[in-house]
Amino acid sequence: MPKVIVGNLEFASIEDYLAALEAWEEARAPFKAQAEVLADEFVDYLREQGLSKGTISKHGKNIEMFIVYLTQYTDADDLATVRKGVVNTEFFRWYRRKVLDRCDPASLESTTRKFFKFLAEKKGIYNEKVLGKRGK
């Protein structure tokens, strides 16, 4: 029976791969659910700020893709400890490869920065790696 190789992982069969994938998705489910709720609350927060529908839509789509990236393509399990490189460089590279959209990296950076500021100000989730030390 042929082996299944994914990245640097090797599985004896497709069944083993699918079982491992299912277990991984199950383990990630709580973080994914939390991140999706926070993304929805972020969009509500943007509405409360009086931003235009177009701006809200763009930030909403960007943060939705960021959550997909975090929950499906990284091992992140806490928004307070996500590295700045994951938020900026790695997410931007992934976005360019996976999303058929000519999004400006500055737009993605603006969205993720607003999202992490929202988390800090409204949810008490402060990510020093992304926002820097408090008071700076």
Spans of model-derived segments:
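Helix-loop junctions and short alpha-helical segments
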Residues: 4-17
